[in-house]
From Swiss-Prot:
GO terms for molecular function: endonuclease activity; identical protein binding; mRNA binding; RNA binding; sequence-specific DNA binding; single-stranded DNA binding. This is Translin. The keyword Cytoplasm applies. It is an enzyme of class 3 (hydrolase).
Amino acid sequence: MSVSEIFVELQGFLAAEQDIREEIRKVVQSLEQTAREILTLLQGVHQGTGFQDIPKRCLKAREHFSTVKTHLTSLKTKFPAEQYYRFHEHWRFVLQRLVFLAAFVVYLETETLVTREAVTEILGIEPDREKGFHLDVEDYLSGVLILASELSRLSVNSVTAGDYSRPLHISTFINELDSGFRLLNLKNDSLRKRYDGLKYDVKKVEEVVYDLSIRGFNKETAAACGEK
């Protein structure tokens, strides 16, 4: 094989990979659009009357996740399953955003942390890499950390809306998250930096709870703060 033939063959490989990446990008754009729609819907809980609409907004968000499932099913067909990490950077950020959105819905519904397995059911993907298109552990953790930031904001807006018990519940939840993350030996630089922001979320929520306790707005909050 001549030098020119070698490079012609290599160009064929490069062109084929570029075609795959372009197909992936198209699906990811659709995923990003649906994620924005879900986020816009859930952001409404921060408004004055948004707390009254939480069940309705969560139900509507779950309907949007059926569209997410469709897009992810399409994405799976765009590349060989064994090459997941070769193209992972294309959907990594939107998948982390979708984890956050799924976790936010579950928290609003039950005030609990969604498991990685439950997220994969909501998204219609696999929990284990051996089974193909899956939810990477670090992507799940990144989504959970985004949730913590969102909940710290919600604690402030809860007070504005006159819901004085919610910040206490959020404080308990975020402190449990912080304790959980302390058990992990995080090697990923991006994940470590995002985890560094969790302490500020914890502090922000604790300040809200403390402010409520000294102002006597909530007996439950005051009693909890007195126990600390």
